[in-house]
């Protein structure tokens, strides 16, 4: 291997490491910034009663679309956390109880990277069912 080729290879490796490091730092910084719903959205009331069937529907949606990152019990320990190096919200955090249903609904609807927006993927009723189910997750 020539000296010039070694230099180029070393430079490519160094650039890759620097870019990867920058992405990790940016990802962590983004995950720590606050995410507040607009006041009008936060004031919305949940029109879907937390009936047994609504909670079952919410649990099914959660298992299918949320647990991969947020974990089965909302502890932010789903399998994608390690694979994708993401830091999802810990839905079992007692602070979540201070969020209004409207705020949770808005966050589910609009998303924030790396969390996708579900406004077009889930019906309005499904999103409210999801809010109801998230409320049942144990807080610790």
What are these regions (language model features)?
Residues 52-75, 81, 104-110:
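Sequence/structural segment immediately N-terminal to covalent heme-attachment motifs in c-type
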Residues 83-137:
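Extracytoplasmic electron-transfer domains, predominantly the class I c-type cytochrome c fold
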Residues 75-76, 124:
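Short, non-ligating residues that shape and space the ligands of small metal-coordination modules
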């Amino acid at each position: 291997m020539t000296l010039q080729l070694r230099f180029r290879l070393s430079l490519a490796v160094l650039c890759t490491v620097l870019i990867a490091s920058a992405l990790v730092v940016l990802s962590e910084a983004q995950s720590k910034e606050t995410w507040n719903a607009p006041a009008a959205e936060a004031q919305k009331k949940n029109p879907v009663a937390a009936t047994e069937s609504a909670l079952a529907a919410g649990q099914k949606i959660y298992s299918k679309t949320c647990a991969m990152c947020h974990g089965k019990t909302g502890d932010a320990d789903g399998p994608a956390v390690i694979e994708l190096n993401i830091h999802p919200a810990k839905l079992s955090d007692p602070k979540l109880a201070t969020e209004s249903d409207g705020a949770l609904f808005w966050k589910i609807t609009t998303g924030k990277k790396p969390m996708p927006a579900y406004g077009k993927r889930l019906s309005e009723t499904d999103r409210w069912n999801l809010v109801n189910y998230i409320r049942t997750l144990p807080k610790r």
